[in-house]
Amino acid sequence: MLIVLSPAKSLDYETPPRVKSHTLPRFIDRSATLIERLRKLAPQDVASLMDISDKLAVLNVTRYADWSPEFTAANSKQAVLAFNGDVYDGLDAKTLSTDDLAFAQKHIRILSGLYGVLRPMDWMQPYRLEMGTRLDNAAGKDLYAFWGDDVTALINKDMAELKHEGSLTLVNLASEEYFKVVRPKVLAARVITPVFEDWKGGRYKIISFHAKRARGTMARYAVTHRVTDPAQLKRFNEDGYAFDKAASDDARWVFRRRLED
């Protein structure tokens, strides 16, 4: 069983990592190709392309200029410790033990516009490049064309290494934007997508902030409980969520909570 997550826009490179162990991204050459393309953009181009402020555009143009194919402790940080958004608040990787991080390294993958797919302990240099960005490139009009089958092929390879655990299942805890880079016809696995709904206004609905955090919390649950069989995820009961069998089907597992009447 392998879990995929989305990355985060917010990054933390100020807090020193509490662990030194790391691995390197496996698509560095492909990332370098994207960086070369991004370096051709002026700040105003980046602001328009990514719909961000001029200040953020300047920051990211600087990041592209500083990016190096040589990853070091001075310019990089482990991905799972560098990302700093709602999903990663739920995952709370900084409090995971060394053994927890080792399990996460085998069972969690982070989809990335720049890096394709990252393992939790892969060193990562700071960047902003969302998967849905329409950055034209030699392969086509966007990043889905750029990555093609490569991300899915690497996920297949990683899952094959877990075959001894018994379940060739990909648990999709990523957003729709990011999971679109995974190609179903190439993927050699069953896909389960957990969905988190909260009671509000007289009905259950997905509330983005809560759903993002819950995805990270479920990933943490899988790590700390050493989950290798997806059926074990039905026991997930953190923060008041519970599996709702009636609202679920084989591919879409719904978890609901009711904090208000």
Swiss-Prot record:
Transmembrane segments: none annotated. This is UPF0246 protein Rmet_0978. GO terms for cellular component: cytosol. InterPro entries: YaaA. It holds the Pfam family H2O2_YaaD. Belongs to the UPF0246 family. One of its GO terms (biological process) is response to hydroperoxide. PANTHER family: PEROXIDE STRESS RESISTANCE PROTEIN YAAA, PEROXIDE STRESS RESPONSE PROTEIN YAAA. It comes from Cupriavidus metallidurans (strain ATCC 43123 / DSM 2839 / NBRC 102507 / CH34) (Ralstonia metallidurans).
